[in-house]
Amino acid sequence: MLTAIIDYSSGNLYSAQKAFEKITASNNLGSVVVTSDPKIISSADRLVLPGDGAFPSCKAELMSSEAYEAMVYGAVEKSRPFLGICVGMQLMATKSYEYQETEGLDWIDGEVKKIDPKD
């Protein structure tokens, strides 16, 4: 089984890769690859979308990457297991208000809002 960590130029790839390699090796769960190759992403058994930075810039990077359509195909059309990490998780929401209002993938009904430090 293959776990594909999606590289769209906006993620904590190294730490995610090392963590998944350790988990898959110790549990005999297949292999892990960091990739932006649509063919590999669309055929992977599991998908991971990391993210590091601001929601608007991560969304723009993802939408302009070759990986986007393959990710949607694998996660939505093929219903493969999908994990978002950090901003990768936030991108699944309906929208975000970080810096500016930005539409998300709308896979999860919800909005990402800044937490007031006073709370």
Q: Residue spans of the language-model regions?
A:
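N-terminal beta1-alpha1 cap of cysteine-dependent amidohydrolase-like domains
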Residues: 1-81, 87, 100, 106-118
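Glycine-rich nucleophile elbow surrounding the catalytic serine of serine-hydrolase chemistry
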Residues: 86, 90-92
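Short, conserved catalytic or interaction motifs in soluble domains
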Residues: 94-97
